């Protein structure tokens, strides 16, 4: 593949990196106040490595992450990074920000493109449903990747991705 997705959204940074003595030493050396700021040198090194190996890096378009607010350290993203919008409800904001910043965008919003979400209410046992909305295949087929914005404002959308997590 010409693309490599670097992930990063599952890292419990504040819990783990605040308890790591090496991380704390690096924070002090770099003058950082929050453990989440360590993502700056991490992603910088990873992005350089991927590009040196003639691949296109892909990152999640993080705007309002719980651990931590990722927009603190990732916007503006480097322009040669393709982003994936996934977080339910925040895709229109990601669409606008990536247009302004010049990043290519893949659309995969959870409320339309997560194909492993329940098809009917009650499809998943309550102990296994952490708040996934019902997302029928009909709803997925009706998805408008441009969210109704003018064509010139969605020219940076490079595709749609349906996701299945297991």
Residue ranges and their predicted role:
Residues 2-3, 10, 25-166:
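Substrate-binding groove of N-acetylhexosamine-processing glycoside hydrolases
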